[in-house]
Amino acid sequence: MNIFRLSGDVCHLIAIIILFLKIWRSKSCAGISGKSQVLFALVFTTRYLDLFTSYISAYNTVMKVVYLLLAYSTVGLIFFRFRNSYDSESDSFRVEFLLVPVAGLSFLENYAFTPLEILWTFSIYLESVAILPQLFMITKTGEAESITAHYLLFLGLYRALYLANWLWRFHTEGFYDQIAVVSGVVQTIFYCDFFYLYFTRVLRGSGKMSLPMPV
């Protein structure tokens, strides 16, 4: 494992923990897209089905289990424990516009036409767009709390570091995963505008990050 992948995993874990603790400590999920969190839980579920069929390393297994537990715990906080604070009206992105194309593409573009491989491919494609309901919600409300912005920052860093990981592996091993790389590029592009707003507004000390309201 190279430093880029390890750093990416750490950023990913930090992002999920930031979100979980934000909801738990504030006893509120205001400003958080439950739809994005459900999509991320679905990403982990379909990607980590190999937990039951193969073993790579203790690190790999532990990280998969932690991601699954935190993802479903976060979904539980949003839709059950603190459901009264969930803003379903603002969280109005039509997720079927993501799920249907992603499902279709995973059947058409994969490395092997087997159930586990198709589901793995589905998870890669879905992860690249799973953040869209959250970004849509922020745009719709016009602002994001700084802690939510920190969560998105670490998610973006995770994705960018994984792109560096793929470049490093191609340079040192000649290994290239087209599906993962293309999906990672797409996902990183979605974060670019957010990165600009984060560094120009949140780091200046504002408690919230204001965004342009949709017309």
Swiss-Prot record:
Keywords from the UniProt entry: Cytoplasmic vesicle, Endoplasmic reticulum, ER-Golgi transport, Golgi apparatus, Membrane, Protein transport, Receptor, Transmembrane, Transmembrane helix, Transport
Location in or out of the cell: Endoplasmic reticulum membrane; Golgi apparatus membrane; Cytoplasmic vesicle, COPI-coated vesicle membrane
Main location: endoplasmic reticulum
Alphabetized Pfam families for the sequence: ER_lumen_recept
Region annotated Interaction with the K-D-E-L motif on target proteins, chain positions: 47-48, 159-169
Entry keyword Membrane: yes
InterPro entries referenced in this protein's UniProt entry, alphabetically: ER_ret_rcpt
Annotated site residues (Interaction with the K-D-E-L motif on target proteins) in this chain: 5, 54, 117
Stretches assigned to the Cytoplasmic side: 25-32, 80-92, 136-149, 200-215
TM ranges: 5-24, 33-52, 59-79, 93-110, 117-135, 150-168, 179-199
Recorded topology in the membrane: Multi-pass membrane protein
Membrane-side (Lumenal) residue stretches: 1-4, 53-58, 111-116, 169-178
Annotated stretches, region: Important for recycling of cargo proteins with the sequence motif K-D-E-L from the Golgi to the endoplasmic reticulum: 204-208
Free-text comment on this protein's domains from its UniProt entry: Binds the C-terminal sequence motif K-D-E-L in a hydrophilic cavity between the transmembrane domains. This triggers a conformation change that exposes a Lys-rich patch on the cytosolic surface of the protein. This patch mediates recycling from the Golgi to the endoplasmic reticulum, probably via COPI vesicles.
Function recorded in the entry: Receptor for the C-terminal sequence motif K-D-E-L that is present on endoplasmic reticulum resident proteins and that mediates their recycling from the Golgi back to the endoplasmic reticulum.
Name of the protein: ER lumen protein-retaining receptor 3
Organism of derivation: Danio rerio (Zebrafish)
